[in-house]
Structure formats: C-alpha cells, structure tokens
Swiss-Prot record:
Biased composition regions of type Basic residues, renumbered to the chain: 120-130
Annotated SUPFAM superfamilies: Bet v1-like, GTPase activation domain, GAP
Region (Disordered): 46-67, 82-161, 387-461, 467-486, 733-757
GO MF terms, alphabetically ordered: GTPase activator activity; lipid binding
Name the UniProt record assigns to this protein: StAR-related lipid transfer protein 8
Gene3D superfamilies per record: 3.30.530.20, Rho GTPase activation protein
Compositionally biased tracts (Polar residues): 99-114, 143-161, 441-459
UniProt cross-references to Pfam families, sorted A to Z: RhoGAP (PF00620), START (PF01852)
Bias kind Low complexity: ranges: 387-397
Keywords for the protein's UniProt record, in alphabetical order: Cell junction, GTPase activation, Methylation, Phosphoprotein
C-alpha cells in the first residue's frame, strides 16, 4: 500500500475510559470487512485473503486501500487512518472531454491497471504492514499481562503516540528515495526519457525528495491541543489538487483549494513532533477544528476544484511552451523510479529534502532556453529574488557582529544559501518556508528598512533568524583590526552599534544633548539646574512641610567605606564599575539587555511575568563568577528580565541616588503635569554622570520594549513593574547611607499613606521618563539662553594651532617640532625632578597614580600613571605608536591622516562608549623621539583643527595633552609614565576627579599586560 504526496490522511484519536478490567477482550472492532477476530488464538485472520490482495474488479471500485486498516492495539483506541489516493496518470482527463461520473471514484480509489511488479510490491508492503501490526499487538498483549490489569493514562498515551508515529513514518516515507538513486537515474536520462518523466510527474514527483515541499502538506490539530501531548485528532492533507491534472499545471508550494488554513508545521518525515507549536520557523494561523470546520473546508475545496477545469482551458494553450521550458530547466530528469530502501531514516529524508529545495530554487532562477510564460514567471520570481536578496541584507549584520565574513554576492541562490549557512545565517530551508508562507526572506535577517545610514541592524535580529543564535552563543571574537595578535584576541567590551544608531539624535537637537557639552558647560548647567529646581520646589511645596530639604548626616557618625573587592556585578555601584572597566554597567547586564531587545521583544508580559527562582539564581551565579563570558542564548526571557530587576534592586542606592530620589518623587507628587519635563531635566542634570548614563541606557532600552506591540507592555505597564526596583520603594536597610526616612507601616501590614503616594509618584514618573526619554537628556534651550555669555566662554577649542597655520609656518621655514617643543620640555623637566609636586592617590592593578592642578587654571586636573613594562623603551614606543589595537579594547578604528615630517604626523582614532551613548572621535597631532639619553623615548600629542573636516563618528573629544615617557630600568625593562588631560564631552569636573585617573592607570596596565611576562624556569643557582 502506498501513500503519495497527493493523498489525504486523517487520524482521529478517541480517548475512552475502560469499563472494567476485561474490556480489552470484550470490545473488539473489525478493522475491515475482510477480517475476523478468532477468540481462541486472540488473533485476526483474513477472510478470503486472495480476494483481499487481488486486483479490483473492473466493474467495482477498489476500496481495499481506502477502508480502515487499523484496529484497537490497546484499550485506548488508536488513530483511524483514512487514505484517498489520486488517479494514475494513465487515466488523466484529456482536454476538451469532461470527466464522466465513472471517472470520479466514490472514495478516490486507485485507477488504471497495475503491472506484475507493482502488484508484487503492494502485496509485500501489505503483508509487512499486517505483520507489523500483529507484532505490536502481541507485544502489547504480553506487556499488559505482566503489568497491572489497568494501565495508567500516561502509559496508554505513550503507546498511542509511539504507534501512531510508527504508522505515520511507514506511510510518509514510503514514497521517498535516496538522493544517490535519484542522481544515478537522472544522470542517464535522455531527451525522450525527460519528456516521459515530465508527463508522469504527478506520480514521480512525490517520490523524489527534490520535489517534496514542507509546505505542501497541512497538519491540522485541535484548537485546545496542549503541546507535548498527543492530540485528540490529527489531520494531514495535501495541497496538491485531487484531480488528476498534470503537474505542469500545478507547482509545489501553490495553494489549491486549501487557502483557508495552513498547518504550523510541514515536516512529515521526521521523528520530531509535527504538531508542536513552533512560532519562530512556522508562522501559525488559526486552525479550523471540529467536524463542522472540516465540512466547511471540504466544501471550499470542492468549490475551488470546480473552477480548475476553466482555468486549465486558458492555460492549456501554453502547454507546449511549458514543456520546452521544463526540458531546458531539467535536462537530466530520470525516466523511472527505483525502490526505496526500508532503512532510510526520516532524519536523512528531511536533510535531503532541505538540500534539494535549494537545488530546486537554484534551477528555477533563469531558464536556459525559451521564455517562461507569465504565470510561471509570477511563481518563480518570488522564490528567486528573496534568497538572492538575503545575503545582501545580512551583510551589515555580519559586519556589525564580526562573527563571520559576510557572504559575497553569487549568481545562484543556492550558493548564497550555502554561504549563509557557513556565516551563521539560516540555510535555504528557512528561505523556502518564508516564500511559501507568504513572508519575505527579510523576516529572518535585518531588512533594508531596519538598517540605518551606516548599514547597521536596528532590530538586532541581530536578527539573523532563530538558528543564528547558535553562533551567537559561541565566544565572540574581536573585530579584525589587521594588527598582530588582535586577529585572535577576544573582545570583552560589548559592541552594540544598532542600539546607538537607533537612538542617534536629530540634527536639530544634536547640539543640545548632554553628552556633547564640555566640562565647563556641564558645571554651569549644574548651577542653573539647582536654581531652577529650587524655584519649582519653593513654588509648589506646602510651606509647613519639610519638602525641599536635603538632610545632612550626623556630625559624629562615621560612614564605613564598603569593600567591593569580592563583588563583580550585583551590589556594586556604577562608580566602581566605571573605575574598573570604563563603563558604568557590567558587561553581563548589557548582554542581558541586548538579548531581551534583540530576541525577546515579542514575549507577552515581559517584566510582568515572573521567572523561575532556581534558574534566576543560576544566572546570578554565572554573572558573579564570569561577568565577561555570560551567554543568555536559550534562557527564558522572563528569567533574564527578573535578573535585570534584581540588579537594580540590589544596588547600594537607587539609580537616582539617595539624595535625589525624594526630589524625583516630589516632582511627580507636587508639580503640575506641564512642569514635569522641565523639573525632571533639571534633576537629571544634577545626577552623577555615571548614574545619568545608566539611567539613559535603561530608559532607552525600556522605550524599545514599550514600542513593540507584541509584548503588550506599554510605558505605564513597565513603570508599574519596574518602579519599586528602580526607586527602592519600601526597602529599608540598616546600613544604607540614604537620608530618606522610611514611613513605618502599621501593625496590620498595610502600606501607609506616604507609601501609597510614593508608589503612585514613582509609577507616573517612570512612565513619563520612558515616554520622553529623548527630551529628558537634553539641555533646556531657555537655560542656554540665560547662560549665554558664560556658556559660550566655557566651550573649549583645540590647544594647538590649526593645521593651516602649521603649513604656513612650514612654508616659511619654521620647523613643526617647535610647536610641540614646549610640551616636550615640560615632560623632561618633570621627569628630571622626579615629578615633584604631584599628589599620589591609590592606583589599580599595581600602578602608581598621581594628580595635580593644571597651571592654566582649567577645572580639569592633570593625571599621571606609571608602571614597569617587561620590554625595552623602543619596543614600548612602537606598541603605543603603531599597535593601539593590542591594548585599547574600546578602539573602533585608527588611521594616520598625514605624515607631516619625520617624527610628526596627523592621527585620527575613534573609541567606543557604552550603548546608546555616542563614540568619541579624536584628531591629534603627535610627535615622538627615540634619541633621549640612556635610550629613553617619548611621545606627545594634542588635538588640533584639521585642514579638511574629518567625518565625525559620534562626539569630537579634545585631547588637551597626552605624554608618554619610556625610561630604561634594567635589562630589557622600562618604566612607562603616562600624563594625560582630556575633555571627553558630556562629563562634569567631578567625574574627572573620581574616574579619569583610574582610566589612565588602566590604560598603562593594559599596555604592560600586552607584553608577555617572561619567567625563569627552574630553581636559582649560586655562582
């Protein structure tokens, strides 16, 4: 018995409870009218087996293959399979002749005469199938006698599921053939055989895995089906027309009479579950359930097939051209079919099926001879263009992630698909699904509308499809910088350019961004914001209540400085993180936010639904043990979201700081709604820079979550879920430095009036800040006008002369080194005096750190960091000068713009920042010397205005002075001293006093660690 791709199979499972222990022997059902049950032997015996296996009579319809062929294999009734076979190609209706009633079978029986080989094959298959059923019966009977008389529901369900899947596999794999047999038969095909095989395609096509489309079979499951259990009813229908028309008029993947519903899966040859919900690869649509739905579907199918003859009349005139086109496309089509080996596994069939779909798409791209008709072009073009466009769209994503080379354009989609599979993208299997299901291939990669001007992905499918996450879980390799060991050095810093580009400010508001203001301007804005906020509070605060007062700590109380040396992620304030790594958020927390933003935006109720405590605890331990190598692939979105909430809840103080948290709450409690934004802008400017950067990253991230309609989490919903964790509401800590006085709850446990008011204000405030996150981090324009003269005076300019002035001086015979000579002499003088007058402070990672005030009265200090390096001075100079990528993890790109003279050049480099904050761009004039006494070397640099504007990559920062001094200190060793003062924009002088010195010390430590440490092997010997 055969079941081809054009058949319709329906499985119905009826779960019945047993009446008693002997119900298995009492309730017996015949599987066919040709069988009888023998009570003595407890077996089924055929009644007139010769009649059963004989060919059907010409005058009667052959119904032996259409009746029920399964019986109860256990007390729980198993699926009843009903098979309808299409007519053989020999009896296809000719054009111009209407099919008679005799041509239409009652139950779609097999038509035509069968040869002796076909009869022998069918007998062998029928006997094998019946033997298989009897063996299952005996196994189950013996198992039931040994076990308890009454089976558990779980056991019955397992037996039912296993039996039904074995039956489905036997049916569905019977028509497939191995790829090697198909290749062998196709290699020896001729022109006549090609034509013969084309005409017999309706039967041959389903047997070759090349033409088996996953979308051509529909699997219908009940609407109340629970994934993981076998369904009550399972219906598999083909999309091929039931009429016996030639396949030239029907292409796999087209909908004929079955447009009303589509299954959520199409794999019928795999051991994997074919009814589980797979939303990522198979877009589900509403499934019609029940007998009424099936009747409606049958009526719709019949109506569609009734118009098929009219359509064929219009298409039949193009038949000759179609056959010419088919010969040109498939010159090696094999003439015959070979027997499939029974041992072919369903996994092999599914693999061959995916590969052959890619071959089919590549062959359908351009016909070699002849011109395809209009209807054929309409069907071929979507299948060809979409895979061809996929590599071009995935290329920016591959460049951004730097995990694999971007696929090069290729003439055939099959080659593109092969390259996509090697580069971490999804193979042609997903592409064919997208085309068949009515979605473009851009659903699995970043579409052109989701790419910004720089070519970076905006929605991070990052977005290369669900299967691309397998490669994302591997250790990330640093982007190739083309310099030495950087080709294989892993990057610990997160590159999240799509988050930066998606929140890039507009040209009108770019100059008002806080992160573009100089340090002196930020200092003025602090004073103006404090005055404005004081005016708001004095105007709207109730006079007799203590509202706008920052309580001072007790006079004799000593605040013990906490020790964070044993902590890495949780409970560590942003200031410690930025001193350690240069970024206020840990890398693992940024990875968690990126994972949620790129792959979990469609999770309904994210941040509202709770995760599993045990899994959250495991994630927390992973963050603490290896904060730079945490992979969230495959983790539940709700677990990762709860982990984020725990991080902000476990901070020593709220992200708004203990001093300003009450101020933020009072803004949304006392001020009118139209004053919220102005007051919140003033309060945000008063936050420490590291806290403000964390708050900006969090609010931009939450705005992206709220903008996704699929998760049903608006800004208000997110505020309700996150406000208690971010504001630290109703959390009292004995050792907390917070001056806020918590209101005590009543004895019955109810929250007090102040608690309710604080919760309401926090929810409204966080919702407002998420909605207006873009404006919240901009400088108020009226404040800039009020500070007009002083604000403009605080804007810095490059300390050195412009490049045009240097060229004029060089033309006049003045050496360019004279412009840097003062800088060099200051460095040599300080070194000769052993840096007298510098104030030492504790430095990280075995470095010496010191600072002093600038002689020009600028609020930014000079910082000095020094350490010993296991390399001679000349090698250290080359490492600093030409191999920055080896020690600067934040470096994005660097280039020498122009070599002005020996030892003097114009240098441009860009460093990254924590997303979504902009990158820092530097254009410096640098000069070096390697002829100092005792073999010492030095390098000095400072910013200048280039002659031609250099395209900015973010914010143009100012390097006021940068000096490197390499002094020999032993055999093969040197002492490296780095003196630096820079305005990175967007940071206050207080940030430079607390953070910038640590960043300089970390820089010299990375230069030191970039050289291998040589250790002597073996014990010391006395000479």
């Amino acid at each position: 018995m055969t079941l081809n791709n054009c058949a319709s199979m329906k499985l119905e499972v009826h779960f019945q409870s047993k009446q008693n222990e002997d119900s298995e022997e009492e309730e017996q059902c015949t599987i066919s009218s040709h069988w009888a049950f023998q009570q003595e032997s407890k077996c089924w015996s055929p009644m007139g087996s010769s009649d059963l296996l004989a060919p059907p009579s010409p005058g009667l319809p052959a119904t032996s293959s259409c009746e029920s062929v399964l019986t109860e294999l256990s007390a729980t009734s198993l699926p009843v399979i009903t098979v309808s076979l299409p007519p053989e190609p020999a009896d296809l209706p000719l054009p111009g002749r209407a099919p008679s009633s005799s041509d239409r079978p009652l139950l779609s029986p097999t038509q035509g005469q069968e040869g002796p080989q076909d009869k022998a094959k069918k007998r062998h298959r029928n006997r094998s199938f019946l033997k298989h059923l009897e063996s299952l019966r005996r196994k189950e009977k013996s198992g039931s006698q040994q076990a308890e008389p009454k089976h558990s529901p779980a056991t019955s369900e397992k037996v039912s599921k296993a039996s039904s899947f074995r039956s489905c596999r036997g049916f569905l794999s019977a028509g497939f053939y191995r790829a090697k047999n198909w290749a062998a038969t196709s290699a020896g095909g001729s022109g006549a055989n090609t034509r013969k095989a084309w005409e017999a395609w309706p039967v041959a096509s389903f047997r070759h895995p090349q033409w088996t489309h996953r979308g051509d079979c529909l699997v219908h499951v009940p609407g109340d089906h629970k994934p993981g259990t076998f369904p009550r009813s399972l219906s598999i229908e083909s999309l091929c027309p039931e009429d016996g028309h030639r396949l030239a008029d029907w292409q796999p993947g087209r909908r004929w009479g079955c447009e009303g519903r589509r299954g959520s899966c199409g794999s019928t040859g795999s051991h994997a579950s074919t009814y589980d919900n797979l939303p990522e690869l198979y877009p589900a649509e509403p499934v019609m359930v029940g007998a009424e739905a099936e009747d409606e579907d049958d009526e719709e199918s019949g109506g569609s097939y009734a118009h098929l003859d009219d359509i064929l009349q219009h298409v039949w005139g193009l038949q000759q051209r179609v056959e010419l086109w088919s010969r040109a496309m498939y010159p090696d089509l094999g003439p015959g079919d070979e027997e499939e080996e029974e041992a072919t596994s369903s996994v092999e069939i599914a693999t061959v099926e995916v590969k052959c779909q890619a071959e089919a798409l590549s062959q359908m791209e351009v016909p070699a001879h002849g011109e395809s008709p209009a209807w054929a072009q309409a069907e071929v073009q979507p299948a060809v263009l979409a895979p061809a466009q996929a590599p071009a769209e995935a290329e920016p994503v591959a460049q951004e992630e730097a995990e694999a080379p971007a696929p090069a354009p290729a003439p055939a989609p099959a080659q593109d698909s092969e390259q996509e599979a090697h580069s971490g993208g999804e193979p042609t299997f997903a592409s064919s699904l997208s085309v068949e299901e009515g979605h473009s291939i851009s659903d699995t990669v970043a579409s052109s509308s989701e790419l910004d001007s720089s070519g970076n992905s905006m929605n991070e499918a990052e977005a290369a499809g669900p299967l691309a996450g397998l490669q994302a879980s591997m250790p990330r390799e640093r982007r190739d910088s083309g310099v030495g060991a950087s080709l294989t050095r892993p990057c610990r810093k997160l590159r999240w350019h799509s988050f930066q580009n998606s929140h890039r400010p507009s040209l009108n508001s770019e100059s008002l961004e806080i992160n573009r203001q100089f340090a002196g301007q930020i200092n003025l804005l602090h004073k103006g914001s404090l005055l404005r906020l004081t005016a708001f509070m004095e105007k709207y605060t109730v006079p007799h209540k203590q509202g706008w007062v920052w309580s001072m700590p007790k006079f004799m109380r000593r605040n013990k400085t906490p020790d964070y040396r044993g902590q890495h992620v949780f409970g560590v304030p942003p200031l410690i993180h930025v001193q350690r790594t240069g970024q206020p958020l840990p890398q693992s927390i940024q990875q968690a936010m990126r994972y949620l933003r790129s792959q979990c935006l469609d999770q309904v109720g994210i941040f509202r639904k709770s995760g599993v405590k045990s899994r959250i605890q495991n994630l927390r331990q992973m963050n603490e043990t290896s904060p730079d190598n945490v992979c969230y692939e495959g983790q539940s979105a709700y677990d990762v979201a709860d982990l984020l909430k725990q991080y902000f809840r476990d901070l020593p103080e709220p992200i708004f700081t203990s001093k300003l948290t009450t101020t933020f709450l009072q803004i949304y409690q006392l001020l009118p709604k139209d004053q919220w934004l102005a007051a919140a802008q003033a309060a945000t400017l008063l936050l420490p820079d590291e806290n403000r950067e964390v708050l900006q990253t969090l609010l931009y991230f939450l705005s992206d979550i709220a903008s996704a309609e699929e998760n049903q989490m608006t800004a208000g919903n997110l505020a309700v879920c996150l406000a208690p964790s971010i504001f630290h509401l109703n959390v009292s800590k004995k050792d907390s430095p917070s001056p806020r006085i918590k209101s005590k709850r009543s004895l019955i446990g109810r929250p007090g009036p102040r608690d309710l008011s604080d919760n309401m204000a926090a929810t409204q405030g966080l919702s407002h800040m998420i909605s207006d996150c873009k404006k919240l981090f901009q400088v108020p324009q009226d404040m800039v006008l009020q500070l007009c003269s002083s604000y403009s005076a605080a804007e810095l300019s490059p300390p050195g002369p412009a490049l045009a002035e240097l060229r004029q001086a060089q033309a006049a015979g003045v050496s360019l080194s004279l412009y840097m000579e003062e800088n060099i002499q200051d460095l040599l003088r300080d070194a000769a005096e052993r840096f007298k007058g510098w104030m030492s402070v504790p430095g990280p990672q075995h470095t010496e750190l010191a600072c002093r005030k600038a002689p020009d009265g600028h609020p930014l200090r000079l910082w000095k960091a020094s350490t010993e390096v296991a390399a001679p001075p000349a090698v250290v100079l080359h490492r600093v000068l030409r191999e920055r990528a080896l020690w600067d993890e934040d470096l994005l790109r660097a280039q020498v713009l122009e070599a002005l003279m020996p030892g003097v050049e114009l240098y441009h480099y860009v460093t990254d920042s924590m997303a979504p904050h902009p990158c820092r761009d530097f254009v410096v004039l640098r000069m070096w010397r390697s002829d100092l006494p005792r073999g010492g070397c030095l390098l000095v640099s400072q910013s200048l205005d280039p002659e031609q504007p250099v395209p900015e990559s973010g914010v143009r920062a100012l390097m006021l002075t940068s000096q490197y001094l390499m002094e020999p200190c032993g055999l093969g060793r040197s002492r490296l001293t780095h003196i630096c003062r820079a305005d990175l924009r967007g940071r206050s002088p207080d940030w430079y006093n607390k953070v910038f010195g640590h960043l300089c010390a970390m820089e010299v430590a990375k230069i030191r660690d970039s050289f291998p440490t040589l250790q002597a092997a073996g014990p010391e010997t006395k000479l």
